[in-house]
UniProtKB/Swiss-Prot annotation:
Higher taxonomy: Eukaryota, Metazoa, Ecdysozoa, Arthropoda, Crustacea
Stated family: Belongs to the complex I subunit 4 family.
Protein name per the record: NADH-ubiquinone oxidoreductase chain 4
Annotated function: Core subunit of the mitochondrial membrane respiratory chain NADH dehydrogenase (Complex I) that is believed to belong to the minimal assembly required for catalysis. Complex I functions in the transfer of electrons from NADH to the respiratory chain. The immediate electron acceptor for the enzyme is believed to be ubiquinone.
InterPro entries: NADH_UbQ_OxRdtase, ND/Mrp_TM
An annotated Gene Ontology molecular function: ubiquinone binding
Pfam family, one: Proton_antipo_M
Main location: mitochondrion
Gene from which the chain derives: ND4
Reactions performed catalytically: a ubiquinone + NADH + 5 H(+)(in) = a ubiquinol + NAD(+) + 4 H(+)(out)
């Protein structure tokens, strides 16, 4: 998790920032599933994944728009 977050915030490319940010979700979900409170950890991981992916779509859209306008 630390390596992915370090790569996320030290990259020079917006696309790589987005990719590393999304890849950092996998270890976080594993942490929730492994050490969460027993009954609520599965729905909590689903909600975490859904809300994070849904809220990062505007970021991807803006990154794609800026890549088109920069060229």
């Amino acid at each position: 998790l630390f390596v992915l977050l370090w790569l996320t915030f030290t990259t020079q490319s917006f696309i790589l920032f987005y990719v590393f940010f999304e890849c950092s979700l996998i270890p976080t979900i594993i942490l929730i599933l492994g050490w969460g409170y027993q009954p609520e950890r599965l729905p909590a991981s689903y909600y975490f994944l859904f809300y994070t992916l849904l809220s990062s779509l505007p970021l991807l859209f803006i990154i794609m728009l800026t890549r088109v306008f920069i060229r």
